[in-house]
Amino acid sequence: MDPMELNNVSIEPDGDSCSGDSIQDSYTGMENSDKDAMNSQFANEDAESQKFLTNGFLGKKKLADYADEHHPGMTSFGMSSFNLSNAIMGSGILGLSYAMANTGIILFIIMLLTVAILSLYSVHLLLKTAKEGGSLIYEKLGEKAFGWPGKIGAFISITMQNIGAMSSYLFIIKYELPEVIRAFMGLEENTGEWYLNGNYLVLFVSVGIILPLSLLKNLGYLGYTSGFSLSCMVFFVSVVIYKKFQIPCPLPALDHNNGNLTFNNTLPIHMISLPNDSESSGVNFMMDYAHHNPAGLDEKQVAGPLHSNGVEYEAQGAEKCQPKYFVFNSRTAYAIPILAFAFVCHPEVLPIYSELKDRSRRKMQTVSNISISGMLVMYLLAALFGYLSFYGDVEDELLHAYSKVYTFDTALLMVRLAVLVAVTLTVPIVLFPIRTSVITLLFPRKPFSWLKHFGIAAIIIALNNILVILVPTIKYIFGFIGASSATMLIFILPAAFYLKLVKKEPLRSPQKIGALVFLVTGIIFMMGSMALIILDWIYNPPNPNHH
């Protein structure tokens, strides 16, 4: 018997697709369950495989205790909501302001609400399919629906999503660790030293911290890291809201061509500190002055609107500081993939469901409603206030945008440190299921081997580092993974599994028609987004010096 598989699930009619009937009421033959569990081929699997099968939410309990799906869940409603919220929240929140800048406020809100609602509907389909299909494992549902191709499709989608998450975390290390070091050393700008090079730093962190943690057989700190990561993101959103009211618009002395602060190597650099309500920090802009002229401006240009503090604002500043409500450009194509990437939690829904106390589909759907709604509010706040801080100059990784405004700021430094610690500790957690899936696929029924354990981890980390070093910006990770694997996990696979496995509803029923429309919508989203992103790569090639 496969673990977490519902061998004896009845398929009695269930008129309410979110029925409150507990899934465990459907079991028969419970007297043989302990014997079946002990005879399971998975009973002797290594601890890492046990953790993967439940995605880390079952702690240190033996797999045999969970081999049958009739076991009662022990996780409270509140903790299940917290676990799912943490599964949703990730690095995608850092790219939402960029998405808003390239869609406009109103269009972004419409898209955000749409993706959130579709994610909830996807969870509904997944929970219904899990009961009818008799399994709480995503890959197993794929195998039951479409055989080996379905299993491989689910495996590839989940693995790609995890690799994308790993890469985005390493990108954050690449972006933010140099800024933290620069702040601690009191440097006003990146001097180009090796210890300020993000490519070197991400390699050092990967080899010195991430790889050793990935070699552990169990990740006992998982629970602590989950809570810490979510707390970091709440702190991040709070600081983004607070800083919006400190950053002036337009930003002083911006170069008219590229929107960056102008530096002139032939002129001395002076620091302008604008008034700030914070007692511990100021908003610092690096300015060049020659005879009190702003950087890069000649005598004729100085005739422009120069303020008494020597800071010149752009002539078109008022227009640049007006929020846009509808925007369409080549980068708008990244919006839906970024949102899809931010809302993916579906591989974690089933393990959390399996551990929910007094579980039922209705109760798990309520958990999903609360978690996704809470993340929706956080995403909207982060995107809106991040966008209103920088408008069109916002970057694809929001934290990095503050680097051109602040040379040093205590609150931002704390956010950067917290986020860096969180993502560094999260990378090994994401790596574990990737490695276990690869081992299960390539070396089925083989005993645990430290050589495979180490070698596969090293290869995965090496490939992700190469990806992070070669790919110029995190938006390509958000865009490609969001358009491919995230769309598969949210739209295509749940709908396809539902159409194939739920037999009691006729093909022309409203439920099946809705699932079919959902499937077609997902395919259109994936193909359209991928096509637009590829066109953007062709006609707007990335700047190799980006970041």
UniProtKB/Swiss-Prot annotation:
Gene Ontology cellular-component annotations: microvillus membrane
Record topology, Cytoplasmic segments: 126-151, 217-220, 354-369, 433-453, 498-514
Biological-process GO terms, alphabetical: L-alanine import across plasma membrane; L-alanine transmembrane transport; L-arginine transmembrane transport; neutral amino acid transport
Substrates-to-products reaction catalysed: L-alanine(in) + Na(+)(in) = L-alanine(out) + Na(+)(out); L-methionine(in) + Na(+)(in) = L-methionine(out) + Na(+)(out); L-asparagine(in) + Na(+)(in) = L-asparagine(out) + Na(+)(out); L-threonine(in) + Na(+)(in) = L-threonine(out) + Na(+)(out)
Activity profile over pH: Optimum pH is 7.5-8.5.
Residues carrying the site annotation Influences on amino acid transport capacity: C232
Main location: membrane
Residues that bear Phosphoserine: S49
Tissue: Detected in liver, in hepatocytes surrounding the central vein. Not detected in heart, kidney, brain, lung, small intestine, spleen and thymus. Highly expressed in placenta.
Keyword Transmembrane helix in record: yes
Molecular function terms from GO: alanine:sodium symporter activity; L-arginine transmembrane transporter activity; neutral L-amino acid:sodium symporter activity
Glycosylation sites: N260, N264, N276
Biased composition (Polar residues): 19-31
Keyword set, alphabetical order: Amino-acid transport, Cell membrane, Cell projection, Disulfide bond, Glycoprotein, Ion transport, Membrane, Phosphoprotein, Sodium, Sodium transport, Symport, Transmembrane, Transmembrane helix, Transport
Regions that span the bilayer: 105-125, 152-172, 196-216, 221-241, 333-353, 370-390, 412-432, 454-474, 477-497, 515-535
UniProt keyword annotation of Ion transport present: yes
Changes seen on gene knockout: Heterozygous mice pups for SLC38A4 die shortly after birth, and only 28% of pups survive to 2 weeks. Heterozygous mice pups have a significantly reduced body and placental weight when the allele is paternally inherited while mice exhibit normal body and placental weight when the allele is inherited maternally.
Region (Disordered): 1-34
Induction: Up-regulated by insulin.
Membrane topology, from the record: Multi-pass membrane protein
Pfam families noted in UniProt: Aa_trans
PTM description: The disulfide bond plays an important role in substrate transport, but has no effect on trafficking to the cell surface.
Note: Imprinted gene expressed from the paternal allele in blastocysts.
PANTHER family for the chain: AMINO ACID TRANSPORTER, SODIUM-COUPLED NEUTRAL AMINO ACID TRANSPORTER 4
Function (record text): Symporter that cotransports neutral amino acids and sodium ions from the extraccellular to the intracellular side of the cell membrane. The transport is electrogenic, pH dependent and partially tolerates substitution of Na(+) by Li(+). Preferentially transports smaller amino acids, such as glycine, L-alanine, L-serine, L-asparagine and L-threonine, followed by L-cysteine, L-histidine, L-proline and L-glutamine and L-methionine.
Protein name per its UniProtKB record: Sodium-coupled neutral amino acid transporter 4
Lineage of the species this protein comes from: Eukaryota, Metazoa, Chordata, Craniata, Vertebrata
